[in-house]
Amino acid sequence: MASDAPWHQGPRACFDLETTGRDPQQARIVTASVVLVSPAGEVQQEWEWLADPGIEIPEEAAAVHGVSTERARAEGRPVAEVTAELGEVLAGFWRSGVPVLAFNAAYDLTVLTRETERHGLPAPEPFPVLDPFVLNKQVHRYRRGKRTLGALCEEYGVVLDAAHTSAADALATERLAAALADRFAELRQPAAALHEAQIGWAAEQAASLQEYFRRKDPAAVVDGTWPVHPRP
């Protein structure tokens, strides 16, 4: 059940994936982490998974998150099992009205949705979702420089240990979102209302970025659908 209180005054979960590639329509899950945080910001519970994605992990991806094909095959569980368990954990939060925070949520949730489809699993209904990537763009529209999780954590004084592990990135996402809410009153909304606002904000941000890209490439397209991209 959704709460009418500002989201940062209640419990929240944070979520991150490390995968086989950058294209969310094709990427497979390699690691996944979910962290439940109390209203006071204390870690209450953690879930972590290592999956065998069923395909080779490209060297470029392994260099980012540190999981090789060999390790995933030796230590990981079948990706269908991981996807099912991850989906159930997230769905439980959403059924209870607990917001799930994810940095660049449209990537992670699109990867998860495509994985559920590949394995004939139910896709959880992602609501409410809070995305510090979208939130930061809304309050700092003309900020120059990178908007990676690492760059924004540095800007807002958030400690990011072991970057590009799903557990560290998930918790840093929550800390970043809390820092944004502390600084910007317009982000201190109930989770459901902020979710709905982000749908429009993400679309506007994508349209602006697409306009910029089209100065050099008239055919450039930026998908502003949020929090899950449709199939192409």
Predicted features and spans:
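DEDD superfamily 3′-5′ metal-dependent exonuclease/proofreading module
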Residues: 1-30, 37-45, 67-232
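Residues at the C-termini of beta-strands that transition into short coil/loop
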Residues: 33, 50-53, 133
